[in-house]
């Protein structure tokens, strides 16, 4: 059963941090060839600090997917690393979080979960549920065009705030991701259209994708 939960940087174990940063290196350096710094086979940066919280999607104690969340009042990639990619960036004051370093380990996902789980959409729902549980008003993130397409396909009513150009001369987008009840409903319906999971569990945090069981007798 896939479970998604949050862990603050200060509570991140050495074992789990090594697994996370190794998977990030395999995703962002090896597969996507981003301009990221890697040490000892791991990718981490100045934003992996006490202000960071990580969402983990785990099956059988193995990390399948993850992202890093930072309240926008703290230093983050939008106002730091990615700022030069845009002509202007104006994040409003309020209870907002920045999401970065989102990935799904495709090999692990296929091996452990098979091809039937919409893991990205499940993780988007987790982001909504986490944000609602903590009282946040929304999420800001910067994505590539392929990730923009994946987000749109999920049905999540995202909005493009700004467009920019990366160091690889590829289009990137600053997005606002709403975390209201409508967003939650849309993602729950998309994930559970075949009634595979216990729906009440899909609106909770932490998030568990508990399969429906056949009635006995």
UniProtKB/Swiss-Prot annotation:
Q: Organism source for this protein? A: Pectobacterium parmentieri
Q: Name one GO biological process term.
A: signal transduction
Q: What is its EC number?
A: 2.3.1.184
Q: Which PANTHER family match?
A: ACYL-HOMOSERINE-LACTONE SYNTHASE, ISOVALERYL-HOMOSERINE LACTONE SYNTHASE
Please state what the protein is called: Acyl-homoserine-lactone synthase
- Which GO MF terms are attached to this record? N-acyl homoserine lactone synthase activity
**Pfam families linked:** Autoind_synth
Reaction catalysis annotation: a fatty acyl-[ACP] + S-adenosyl-L-methionine = an N-acyl-L-homoserine lactone + S-methyl-5'-thioadenosine + holo-[ACP] + H(+)
Q: Which InterPro entries match?
A: Acyl_CoA_acyltransferase, Autoind_synth_CS, Autoind_synthase
| Job description of the protein | Required for the synthesis of OHHL (N-(3-oxohexanoyl)-L-homoserine lactone), an autoinducer molecule which binds to ExpR and thus acts in virulence (soft rot disease) through the activation of genes for plant tissue macerating enzymes.
Q: Which UniProt keywords apply?
A: Autoinducer synthesis, Quorum sensing, S-adenosyl-L-methionine, Transferase, Virulence
